[in-house]
Amino acid sequence: MLRLSSICLILSFITLLAEEGPHWAFIKPNRHKLPTVKQTDWPINPIDYFILSKLENANLKPSPAADRITLLRRVHLDLIGLPPTPGEVKSFLNDKSPDAYKKIVNNLLASPHYGERWGRHWLDAARYADSDGYSHDAPRVMWQYRDWVIGAINSDMPFTQFVIEQLAGDMLPSATTAQRIATGFHRNTQINTEGGVDKEQFRVDSIFDRIATTGEVMFGLTFGCIQCHDHKFDPFPHVEYYQMFAFFNQSDEPRVEAPTQEENKRRDEHNEKVVDLNARVKASKAKAPERKKLETELAKLKKTRPRATTALVMQQRKSPRVTKRFIQGDFTRPSEVVQAGTPSVLHVFPKNKDPNRLDFARWVASPNNPLLARVTVNRMWQRYFGKGIVETENDFGTQGTLPSHPKLLDWLATEFAKVGWSPKSMHRLIVTSATYTQSSNARADAKEVDPLNILLARQERLRLDAEIIRDAALASSGLLSQKMGGPGVYPPQPPGCMNLGQHRKTWKASSGEDRYRRAIYTYRWRATPHPALKVFDTPDAFSCSTKRLRSNTPLQALTLLNDPAFMEISKGLARRVIENKSSDKERVIYGFQLCLSRDPDKREVFILEDFLRRQQSSFETAPNETKTLLGAQDPLPNIKASQHAAWIMLARVLLNTDEAITRE
């Protein structure tokens, strides 16, 4: 029994909440006026007024702009995930026009590499992988969805359309193959192929995963707990969870043909042969044995029709299922029947006799949705500054953190809608702001007032994501393949890694340019992800991931030094600097430019030249070690084997520097 005083306290708390009204995140964002600032010469675009206003209130000033080389490297890594080439750095430094930086930004947004960089962020949230998960972790064909994401981002598909096609592209009028492939977003759930699996339990668990992912990605909310009971903190009743469940409960999960251009070409050629042979059979006046031979040949040809790549998609059922609420989330304890619906605390769901998944998708993408734009621009902001305006980027509920700049968040959300939900427009706006272009150097005055840099008196220094560390190294070495799309590839990895799961898998390293593709194309096993990516905190794809963690361990340095792929990259970098420059000093400077985008200072040149001499001397007395390090490489003309080996060691040093794996 509660004491009377406790009951009164609870009732007072409930009354207080009622008086406060709806939680801020559940109210449609307003477009606030730009605040007045004192330092009027600093803002470049509206973002800066909101940031500067908060800084001035705290008696802080923004940091100076980053130097041009730092800024160029930063925006390259942020927008396309690759460092600028020495030629691009030189061209930018020589361009004195006032719009030089804006031209760089526009070129990067137009690059196909932009979709690869920002597609990786989305694939994390979509829990994309090339295997089923669970202990069997069988392979699956999902790369068509990955390529769809990259293509949609490169084409600057309006974000609302991007959302609708992934939630219900199969239900759009005259849905294309691409729109059906888009529904792979919710086929990224794990598939349990173990013996003794209860198929209905697995099907229900998949829907639970889809609701949880939709909640986190589209709403920045945690719906998992209302699977079993009313939300303890947010106004989401248990029954409303199963109203959303009803939308996904009407879907089948087929595998459909999604032929590539090359496969369509082979099929067309095959069909032409069938038509030609069929005509010959009909026109034949040959005797029975010869005619029979032609007919047999035709039958064989029809059976050998080239196969097409398949894709996992969503498809609406012809016969609807009845949806019931599960007591405490237990599918074996169904309760009352529920109809499809949406959380009542959010924007109104249009009245429809038989609402379906497409209606739900359009409701999610509605301009009246108070969360979609806020959550999306907040995640964009997070990628550029290390944390979002709302730091709990996947919890906009009452237990999440309050926005550090609430008026800026709302302004960005309304701006996103105003520019037609164009992600490229928002990226352009953010990276051309004075806020983004600040130096990341720490300042004592700002650290004292704002130790976590919440007010953004400077930029943030961030370690690169796992995939970008590999991609940047490949680009520096000159080995990076520009090939896009297609099935996953298998870059080298240490032996024995595939023995770690319950069932051994094979990993035959790719050859040719597939060996040096961007990491987004690396085959992604859930149970045994590529170790060089995992050690740098790539998510495991078992569930939705909207923010990368950043650890700092000795294993990371050892990976950059000794991983088979990075050894090949080091050899490629060494060969590149040797072949392109003649003196040691020129080669040191060139290697620095390739890896760090800048020239070394005199002290750095001295240290590296001294290291090079000591390494060469060591290899001259150890011919077997030299031979082992060089491996099967073609010898370089006019250079000793010991000197070549020393350059490989220096390349390993450059790729292992903190600066090489950091975005300033």
Where are these regions (language model features)?
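Short, surface-exposed polybasic-aromatic patches that bind anionic ligands, especially phosphate groups
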Residues: L650
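Electrostatic cytochrome c docking/interface patches
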Residues: T36, F202-G215, A283-S284, P289, ...
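Sequence context surrounding c-type heme c attachment/ligation sites in exported
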Residues: M171-E272, L533, S545
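Primarily short, surface-exposed interaction patches in extracytoplasmic proteins
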Residues: Q39-R73, D78, L82-H113, R127-S174, ...
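Post-cleavage N-terminal segment of exported redox proteins
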Residues: L17-P35, S155, T160-I207, Q250-P254, ...
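Bacterial N-terminal signal peptides
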Residues: S5-T15
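A structural supersecondary motif
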Residues: Y523-R526, K534-C544
